[in-house]
């Protein structure tokens, strides 16, 4: 069988929090307010209020909880808008989101940025494998929380996060996979074909935080690449083994890249948004 690193129950709790956040964000942004949809929103909100305060890393070397904190903040921001006019509910949602910011601060890597593994030192503050895409995910969540709910963010960690993304970028605006990959920029996963689904997230994260380096033209180039080279990540989409196909793409890259591609499209003038 295929060995998956997912220590129970922590890893399962983290993935459930992250996937629930993504689903709830999508439902709320869809504008669907049929009775059965509203019931699902209420149920997910109650689950978040109960479970997110309990979310921690599963073991000292696996920090999948970072995904739950990040997508939890984004879902809470959408709930905050949904509860407009209900001051008590909005206050509870904001307070919960602020605790998630503190958890992200706790799990920031000593090198700057965020990752989800620490196989070597196993320290209280991670010293392991911060990755470009996990850092971009966190930075997008922090930005959304600040813009929508006025969350207080840790300035040092925010600055270090942006600087980490810059260090991961190669001259063609591919982003290497993780911190140690900076020394192997032409390894297959770090080439443009392996960065198709990371560059969307990293480019938009830098832009929303005021970094002008990923220009509109660069954003468009990488959106075009994602569309034209779709086959490479589509092949990976149903492969059970991670990084087993062209340019070491994994199945989840397919969905991750498209999720942030929509944010990239929103950066562009309306005249440039059509394919």
Regions found by a protein language model. Give the residues of each.
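Preference for long, amphipathic alpha-helical scaffolds in soluble/luminal domains
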Residues: 1-275
């Amino acid at each position: 069988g295929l060995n998956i690193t997912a220590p129970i129950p922590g890893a399962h709790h983290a993935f459930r929090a992250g996937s629930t956040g993504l689903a709830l964000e999508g439902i709320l942004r869809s504008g669907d307010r049929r009775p059965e949809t509203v019931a699902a929103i209420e149920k997910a909100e109650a689950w978040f209020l109960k479970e997110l305060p309990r979310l921690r890393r599963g073991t000292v070397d696996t920090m999948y909880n970072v995904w739950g904190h990040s997508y939890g903040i984004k879902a809470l921001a959408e709930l905050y808008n949904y509860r407009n006019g209900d001051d008590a509910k909005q206050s509870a949602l904001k307070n919960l989101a602020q605790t998630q910011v503190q958890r992200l601060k706790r799990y920031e890597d000593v090198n700057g940025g965020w990752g989800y593994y620490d196989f070597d030192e196993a320290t209280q503050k991670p010293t392991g494998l911060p990755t470009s895409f996990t850092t971009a995910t966190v930075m997008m969540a922090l930005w959304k929380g600040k813009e929508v709910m006025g969350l207080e963010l840790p300035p040092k960690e925010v600055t270090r996060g942006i600087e980490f993304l810059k260090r991961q970028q190669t001259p063609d605006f591919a982003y290497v996979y993780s911190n140690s990959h900076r020394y192997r920029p032409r390894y297959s996963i770090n080439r443009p074909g392996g960065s198709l689904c990371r560059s969307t997230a990293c480019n938009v994260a830098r832009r929303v935080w005021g970094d002008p380096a990923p220009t509109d033209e660069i954003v468009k180039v990488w959106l075009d690449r994602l569309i034209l080279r779709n086959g490479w990540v589509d092949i990976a989409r149903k492969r059970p083994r991670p990084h087993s196909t062209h340019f070491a793409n994994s199945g989840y890259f397919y969905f991750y890249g498209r999720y942030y591609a929509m944010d990239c499209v929103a950066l562009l003038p309306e005249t440039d948004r059509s394919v």
